[in-house]
Swiss-Prot record:
Family the entry assigns: Belongs to the radical SAM superfamily. Lipoyl synthase family.
Organism per entry: Natronomonas pharaonis (strain ATCC 35678 / DSM 2160 / CIP 103997 / JCM 8858 / NBRC 14720 / NCIMB 2260 / Gabara)
Cofactor (UniProt): [4Fe-4S] cluster
Protein keywords: 4Fe-4S, Cytoplasm, Iron, Iron-sulfur, Metal-binding, S-adenosyl-L-methionine, Transferase
InterPro entries: Aldolase_TIM (IPR013785), Elp3/MiaA/NifB-like_rSAM (IPR006638), LIAS_N (IPR031691), Lipoyl_synth (IPR003698), rSAM (IPR007197)
Protein name: Lipoyl synthase
Binding site residues for [4Fe-4S] cluster 1: 37, 42, 48, 281
Amino acid sequence: MSSRRRKPEWLRTRPPSGRRFTEIKETLRDRDLNTVCEEANCPNLGDCWSGRDGPGTATFMLLGDRCSRGCNFCDVATGGMDPLDPDEPANVAEAVAEIGLDYVVLTSVDRDDLDDGGAGHFAETIREIKRRDTSVLVEALIPDFQGDTDAVDRIIDADPDVVAHNVETVERLQWPVRDRRAGYEQSLDVLRQIAAADGCYAKTSLMLGVGEYAHEVYRTLGDLSEVGVDIVTFGQYLQPSRSHLEVFEYVTPDTFDVWKRVAETEFGFLYCASGPMVRSSFKAGELFVEALERDGLDIEAARAAAERQ
């Protein structure tokens, strides 16, 4: 099924606008910072940046704006890697403070060209944010670091509140969806390592609509639960351009609702954000705090609970 046909009504969004959106964009430009919201053309950009009742969520993309890998679903540019910007950790922390974020998501391109995959730079950014304000919640959405457990530990040791790594799709479809250097078992190993650590929650995300079968999604939820993942999200894959992987199907909102119920009630995930427009970082702060409140936890209690896991 071609993704070039007319999108269903539930996938139509309005372009981002408003004072809050403009303020955040200007702050990012002033500090020459990248966000995955913009680089990957996320459809929720305006919604997340504006927030519903607070300052919202922004996802900063570290280590440059070009990736060393070429996943067939992703709109981030590949190749031509630049040196790391030594001022980026401080600039990100300053932007977080200026915008007034109380929940920030940090992600990065893959940097297989660097000895540590960029883990040290990533970790330093987390520490810079926490140095300025220990109350800011930090979610680190990390690459697989080519299976380097020491690199993953460097992220964990920087004390983020949530560490995410996206498995992206079911095992059968890892290729052609992801770059051949990625792999299902390698991603499960990263998530297992995160889940075994003290003081943070483990999170992952899957795209639907790339040709997966329901029993494969169910099995993937089982695998994720088995390695200790706390949070999972589901969203519709949308083709960034005609040169990218085609959409196999547009999954209905009702189907996304079913997967949310299965994930939370049958597999016991802390929460599952599931919907056609959901992305890994979609309203991450709002949903995380709501999930903690449902469990009767405040932020400090949640951190203590994570340390006891």
